Amino acid sequence: MSKERLLKVLLAPHVSEKSALLADASEQYIFKVVPNATKPEVKQAVESLFDVKVQSVNMINIKGKTKVFKGRVGKRNGLRKAIVRLAPGQEIDFVGAE
């Protein structure tokens, strides 16, 4: 897999109260990923970008909500997230990452 593809797979860390609790309790981190990303791609991208050992990857597809604005029905974009579990003793520091 090309280095360019690995850099494009991860869009951003998903920062929320639930993701912070997962990171503290069970060494799981949540990332927003491109819609066509696969588990092996996400695993390889996290391992190469953050120099950590990934134990498992779970993927979630979230449908976009239907909204009404000024009488018109519209749809928000969907989202794909990856929950990455690291090997014991590993952690990712987003504040110190470059």
Curated annotation (Swiss-Prot):
One MF term in the entry's GO annotations: structural constituent of ribosome
Highest rank taxon of the organism: Bacteria
One Gene Ontology term, aspect cellular component: ribonucleoprotein complex
Coiled coil: none
This protein's UniProt keywords: Ribonucleoprotein, Ribosomal protein, RNA-binding, rRNA-binding
UniProt function note: One of the early assembly proteins it binds 23S rRNA. One of the proteins that surrounds the polypeptide exit tunnel on the outside of the ribosome. Forms the main docking site for trigger factor binding to the ribosome.
Subunit structure: Part of the 50S ribosomal subunit. Contacts protein L29, and trigger factor when it is bound to the ribosome.
Protein name: Large ribosomal subunit protein uL23
Species, as recorded: Hydrogenovibrio crunogenus (strain DSM 25203 / XCL-2) (Thiomicrospira crunogena)
Gene expressing this chain: rplW
